[in-house]
Amino acid sequence: FSEKLSKVGTHPIIGSQINLKAGGTIGKVTLYAKTNQGYKNLTKLSSLSYLKSNQSEEPACEINDLVSNNRDLILLTGNQRDFFGKLYYENKIKIFNEIINVLKKNFENRIYFEVQRHNEIDEKNYENFILNSSKSLKIPLIATQEVFYINEDMYEAHDALKCIGEKNFIEDNNRFKFSNEHYLKKHEELLDLYSDIPEALENNFNFHLRFSFKPKKTKPILPSIANAQSNSPENELQRQAKEGLENRIKNFIIQKSKIKNENEIKKIYEDRLNHEINIINSMDYASYFLIVSDYIKWAKKNSIPVGPGRGSGAGSLVAYCLDITDLDPIEYDLIFERFLNPDRISMPDFDIDFCEEKRDKVFEYLKSKYKDGVAHIITFGKLKARMALRDVGRVLGLSYGHVDRLCKMVPFDPSRPLTLQESIDREPRFKEEVKNNPKVKKLLDLLEMTRKKVN
């Protein structure tokens, strides 16, 4: 994120929304990192919010956690739906003031009362309270916008995506709806919107001047896997890989190889193995291969089914010798450099499939072995044409049968999935549906808008 912004001439400002917990209330504040120390504190608070919370509640930090790790962080208080807004509407004004005073004392000039104007219910009451609190507590105001999409015409697409996530219907009038003001406003619009509180807008325009920090590129820090025999991960990788190759040649490779000379087979495989080991060690990834090998061997030993390997990782002979994969890359003419080569910037990534019913046992093993060195990561995917049709069709209230009929008009080709627009262009029945049914036209319009929103 930071590198891409820097390349287009924009300085990144790194921040995160963190939940706070106090007085029976949980809600968000926004924190921004001024320095590398601030960035460390931000990531620590994010981790603490998950580590200290039980599964029945939202991840959140205690006020003491925030105070103890506030160095080089800037705090914005959020809107009427966030932590301080919730305290106000729950009539916990005493707790509001106590916490604000504690934060003001510790954050000093690094705290702002946030003002947001989205033309939403109860927004004005909270704003008036914040304006008065700003004067009495001498905490500066900052005008901000909660942006969910770029352009104003993306409101309906965002609303549809929200309904998909919440399993609601668009026509349900009892659900919570955001206003249509959550788009990225232009400079002139902000000047007009906050003309009565120019100091809040000025603090917004000058906010970026408080930041010169940019996270440095770092290589992953992996646990060192070695034993007394090997002294280093590199030596341990070589030892295990060579032992594994001997086992593979003896039990599998000789029986299947078209080459009948055992010495010739050994030379081909040993040359390839040494080539791969040299590349892996030169890139400091020996520990990664050993870690993956260890938990796969553990899973197999504990009767947890593991896939044979897929993706470019199946091209590694080292992986085959370490039991990470069960595919002989030389037999199938697979290329190691597709998985790892000195020109590859990012870390290698094995695609490992575990039995769905027992995969949690693998997580538990990793947590017991590496303690707080283990974390889950989030991934984002795009909806394929058929799934997008089903999801948006459902929130529009179309019947299952109708949506299913539309989905069957989308050609299924796993090798080259068609976009929705390509399917519509190829299928005349789609055009008939659009012509005869306003809801189907709405469905396709929303799908086009959601596609633009994602892109």
Predicted regions and their residues:
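Alpha-helical scaffold/interaction cores of sigma-54-like transcription cofactors
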Residues: 1-455
